[in-house]
Each structure stands twice: as C-alpha cells, then as structure tokens.
Swiss-Prot record:
Keywords: Biotin biosynthesis, Pyridoxal phosphate, Transferase
Recorded superkingdom: Bacteria
GO BP term, pick one: biotin biosynthetic process
Organism in which the protein naturally occurs: Photorhabdus laumondii subsp. laumondii (strain DSM 15139 / CIP 105565 / TT01) (Photorhabdus luminescens subsp. laumondii)
Residues that bind substrate: 21, 133, 350
Name of this protein: 8-amino-7-oxononanoate synthase
C-alpha cells in the first residue's frame, strides 16, 4: 500500500466514527472568555483554573525577563540554555513543595516521557492506573519495562499486582487529579501499598497543583503524601506552559545525565521562567482565587443535578457531563457554541468507548450568571 492510500483510509475511518478532530483559530482566551473571529464566547473549556494567564504581574514579569534575557534560551540547558532565571525557579519550586530538587521540562508530556524513559529497564515493571494520562501510558508502553494496569483508583487492585514478583524495580504511576473525569486518586492508600513493597510512586499532579492543598501545593500535599517523583505542570493553574519534576538529589542528577527529553530539548525561555516565578508567588497568596473557584464548583454541581446527564464523582474544576454517544456529544458542543458558549466534546480514544462527554472546566474567573447561562443552554437543547 502506498502512503497516500494508507493516509486516505485512516482519515476515512476517523470521519466515519464521529471522531473527527478540528482546530479553530482563536484570537485569545482567558479563564472566562474565548475570543474568536466570529465573536466572544463564555469559555468552559479552559484549564486556566485561577485566571492567571491574564494576570498583570505575571505578564510584567515576562516582559522584564524578555528585556533582560531576550526571547529565547538559545539551546538545551546542558549547553547554553540554563540561566539564573531557570535556577531560581527550580529552587523556588523545590522549597515550596518540600523536595531537595526540581528540574524544568518544556511540557508535562515531555516530563512524563523523559522520566519513565530514563528510569525503566527491561527487568523493571510499571504499574499504572488504567485511566492515567496518554503521556504516561504512551511512555510506559514504549519503555522496555513490563506494563501492568490497576483498576481505576482501586488500591486493592494495585496491591494484587504488587504481590506478583518482579526481577527489577517497580514504579507505580497515577495522576493526582484525573484530567478527563476530575476525580482525585486515593494517594495515601496508593502510597502505602507502594511503600510496603519497597517501590516508588510517581504522581502527575497537573490538575491539582495550584488549586488543591495549602498555598496551592497540590493534591499530594492535601493528602499528606510525598511521592518519590512528583510532576507538576504549568499549563493549567499557573496560566503558562512547561513542567517540573520534583525529586531527591540523586534522582535529579540521574535525570540530568540520562533523561533525553531534558538533554536534547531547547529549554524554556528565561523570560518564561521569570514569569513562572511570579506565578508561583501568585498561587502561594491565591487563597481568595481558590475559594472563588471552589464556590463556582459547588454552584455548578448543585445546578447540574437538574440536568439529564451523568456527573462524575468530581469535586475539582473538571466537571464532565457524560453523554456516552459520540454524535450527541458533538451536537451538544455545536449547539452550545451557537449560543455563545465554548465547551468541547471529548470522545474516544481520549476517553474509553461509550463515555463521550462534554468536558466542562470551571475557573475562578467565572461568575454565577455564566454558569446559569450554561445551564439554561443545556436545558434548552434537551427540551
């Protein structure tokens, strides 16, 4: 089969299953609105949970950083791309989250892939929550280690897998807050099972950091758990992009030597690192923002009980409405867009078959009347 025939067949198959993805050019978005060429929408698809992407102090910090350092890092951190701004941010993150070391990566995807690829060998084993993020599962599947999956958020299932002998090391992998369902992992129980067997726990807290725990330290801090490896990302509550790996000094040194995603990637611009340092300060003092976000979550859940859709067991900013049918989820999304509301449909393979949904996300920037408008639109569609 030639290349064109292969691509045509795959694209036709994707179109026929109501799973076709499209990008749309937008002018800008924030925690409340999305601005497109055809107008302004209420934005219920943003991960900008605290509204920090438009924070004046963070914008100013980036501008000052660009004036001081220029707009790019110029190379890998192993060559020319590691500046004082990067070093200060790493130390700030380590001090804040209670770890000896932090290492910056260009994205959460890169951090998850880089850590797993560097640590695991063919004698090792990865045991992951079956609903873990694609970056974690792909890294595990591509690594030489054996992959086993435990039932979602069930420590008993994990314990059964851990009881099976492994020649090498075992790494248990989960998310702190799950990106598609919004539910929280029982981290204390998972960590206890992991430690009993002398293994390591790696937690991706992309959707917990900034919004959970004291000073926004995340779901691990909230549950009084300190995993051996903690991944935090900056594309959600921080309002920017990038990620960091928190770990002990020996592990950090190992990753500096062996994590190819770190070694061979151009590091984030120093101006971005400086902006992230300001974002950390905003998060640390952001109790009012977190309180406002929680009020919006509570209000949404009260109102959504009246809708003919299934809610997940989520107390976080991620509040999916399970529609099940792929075509219906797309129709709902399009109907909402016609009414000035931006909510995207999430379908397989991002979520399991039969669980298509509207992935609604709430932020501290939303107002109660915004949620009322969303509810009215959803009721109108069903009627």
């Amino acid at each position: 089969m030639d290349w064109s025939s292969y691509l045509s067949r795959q694209l036709s198959e994707r179109r026929s299953t109501s799973l076709w993805r499209q990008r749309q050019v937008n002018q800008k978005s924030d925690g409340r609105f999305l601005y497109a060429a055809d107008g302004k929408y209420l934005n219920f698809s943003s991960n900008d949970y605290l509204g920090l992407s438009a924070n004046p102090a963070i914008i100013s910090a980036w501008q000052r950083g660009a004036e001081q350092y220029g707009v790019g890092s110029g190379g890998s951190g192993h060559i020319t791309g590691y500046t004082k701004a990067h070093q200060l941010l790493e130390q700030q993150l380590a001090d804040w989250l209670g770890y000896p070391k932090a290492l910056l990566f260009i994205s959460g995807y890169s951090a998850n892939q880089g850590v797993i690829a560097a640590l695991m060998t063919e004698q090792d084993r990865i045991i992951a929550d079956r609903l873990s993020h694609a970056s974690l599962m792909e890294a595990a599947m591509h690594s030489p280690a054996q992959l086993r999956r435990f039932l979602h958020n069930q420590p008993e299932s994990l314990a059964n897998l851990l009881a099976t002998p492994c020649v090498g090391k075992t790494l248990v992998v989960t998310e702190g807050v799950f990106s598609m369902d919004g539910d929280c992992a029982p981290l204390a129980d998972i960590h206890q099972q992991t430690r009993i067997s002398g293994n390591w726990l790696m937690v991706d807290d992309a959707h917990g950091i900034g919004v959970c725990g004291e000073q926004g330290r995340g779901s691990c801090w909230q549950q009084k758990v300190k995993p051996e490896i903690l991944i935090v990302t900056f594309g959600k509550a921080f309002g920017l992009s990038g990620a960091a790996v928190l770990c002990d000094e020996q592990t950090a040194e190992y990753l500096i030597q062996y994590a190819r995603h770190l070694i061979y990637s151009t590091s984030m611009p120093p101006a971005q690192a400086q902006a992230l340092s300001e974002a950390v300060r905003q998060i640390q003092s952001g109790d009012e923002l977190r309180q406002r976000l929680q009020q919006n979550i509570n209000y949404f859940r009260r109102q959504a009980q009246k809708l003919p859709f299934n809610l997940t067991d989520s107390t976080t900013a991620i509040q999916p409405l399970i529609v099940s049918d792929n075509e219906l989820s797309v129709s709902l999304s399009q109907s909402l867009q016609q009414k000035g509301i931006w909510v995207k449909a999430i379908r397989p393979p991002t979520v399991p078959p039969g669980s298509a949904r509207l992935r609604i996300t709430l932020t501290a920037s939303h107002m109660p009347q915004d949620i009322d408008m969303l509810m009215e639109a959803l009721h109108g569609f069903r009627s």
